[in-house]
Amino acid sequence: MAKAYDHLFKLLLIGDSGVGKTCLIIRFAEDNFNSTYISTIGIDFKIRTVEIEGKRIKLQVWDTAGQERFKTITTAYYRGAMGIILVYDITDEKSFENIQNWMKSIKENASAGVERLLLGNKCDMEAKRKVQREQAERLAREHRIRFFETSAKSSVNVDEAFSSLARDILLKTGGRRSGNSSKPSSTDLKVSDKKNSNKCSLG
């Protein structure tokens, strides 16, 4: 019996507690939003199969607790991850400053060459913004990674961010041997077309 997918990619979301990691995963995997999620205890994951470049990609997206006391639990899960999304909250400057610590944690624990993506969540809360887009763009350039601003609440750029990371992993693993590594268009990921006027950025 043929497999229901061509590739299985394990993705990991890391970042401070309260930045919206669980909400992002629920939005991506189930297209749902609930603002009352309690802080994740331990680790959980969701699965969604998407189509990118004509390949069926099964994404196993792992949620991690941001609290330091869970660091030993999260460390074990870095190793098998093919892609890591570093999440901060645009209304919380400290969560952005701590991205450098999370970068260090990736370097110490993850596989060499793991794909990374920087994600500024809660961009629907523009009035409370503490982290300017330019700051994050600068950090992303510094580390040579992609950057998106998302809103799990309004669904802005959530599919696009996961699609971008999955596509980069696919290219790296030889899923497509083309020289075209430009950023993904909205057609790369077969999802429902969500119309919105939110001005969150993607990079």
UniProtKB/Swiss-Prot annotation:
Tissue expr: Highest levels found in lung, kidney, whole brain and spinal cord. Expressed in all tissues tested including Sertoli and germ cells (at protein level). Also detected in osteoclasts.
Cross-link (Glycyl lysine isopeptide (Lys-Gly) (interchain with G-Cter in ubiquitin)): 46, 58
UniProt protein name: Ras-related protein Rab-13
Assembly behavior: Interacts (GTP-bound form) with MICALL2; competes with RAB8A and is involved in tight junctions assembly. Interacts (GTP-bound form) with MICALL1. Interacts (GTP-bound form) with MICAL1, MICAL3, MICALCL, EHBP1 and EHBP1L1; ternary complexes of RAB8A, RAB13 and either MICAL1 or EHBP1L1 are possible. Interacts with PRKACA; downstream effector of RAB13 involved in tight junction assembly. Interacts with GRB2; may recruit RAB13 to the leading edge of migrating endothelial cells where it can activate RHOA. Interacts (isoprenylated form) with PDE6D; dissociates RAB13 from membranes.
Molecular-function annotations in GO: GTP binding; GTPase activity; protein kinase A catalytic subunit binding
Compartments reported by the entry: Cell membrane; Cytoplasmic vesicle membrane; Cell junction, Tight junction; Golgi apparatus, trans-Golgi network membrane
Positions of GTP binding: 17-18, 20-23, 40, 66, 121-122, 124, 152-153
Pfam families (UniProt xref): Ras
SUPFAM superfamilies: P-loop containing nucleoside triphosphate hydrolases
Motif segment (Switch 1): 31-45
Membrane topology, as annotated: Lipid-anchor
Keyword terms of this UniProt record: Cell junction, Cell membrane, Cell projection, Cytoplasmic vesicle, Endosome, Golgi apparatus, GTP-binding, Hydrolase, Isopeptide bond, Lipoprotein, Magnesium, Membrane, Metal-binding, Methylation, Nucleotide-binding, Phosphoprotein, Prenylation, Protein transport, Tight junction, Transport, Ubl conjugation
Short sequence motif named Switch 2, residue ranges: 63-80
Annotated segments matching region Disordered: 173-203
S-geranylgeranyl cysteine lipid modification positions: 200
Keyword Ion transport in record: no
Description of activity control: Regulated by guanine nucleotide exchange factors (GEFs) including DENND1C, which promote the exchange of bound GDP for free GTP. Regulated by GTPase activating proteins (GAPs) which increase the GTP hydrolysis activity. Inhibited by GDP dissociation inhibitors (GDIs). Activated in response to insulin.
Phylogenetic lineage: Eukaryota, Metazoa, Chordata, Craniata, Vertebrata
Annotated organism of origin: Rattus norvegicus
Cofactor(s) required for function per UniProt: Mg(2+)
GO BP field: bicellular tight junction assembly; cellular response to insulin stimulus; cortical actin cytoskeleton organization; endocytic recycling; endosomal transport; endothelial cell chemotaxis; establishment of Sertoli cell barrier; exocytosis
Catalytic reaction(s) noted: GTP + H2O = GDP + phosphate + H(+)
Protein family per UniProt: Belongs to the small GTPase superfamily. Rab family.
Broadest EC class assigned to this enzyme: hydrolase
EC number: 3.6.5.2
Keyword Cell wall biogenesis/degradation among record annotations: no
Stated role: The small GTPases Rab are key regulators of intracellular membrane trafficking, from the formation of transport vesicles to their fusion with membranes. Rabs cycle between an inactive GDP-bound form and an active GTP-bound form that is able to recruit to membranes different sets of downstream effectors directly responsible for vesicle formation, movement, tethering and fusion. RAB13 is involved in endocytic recycling and regulates the transport to the plasma membrane of transmembrane proteins like the tight junction protein OCLN/occludin.
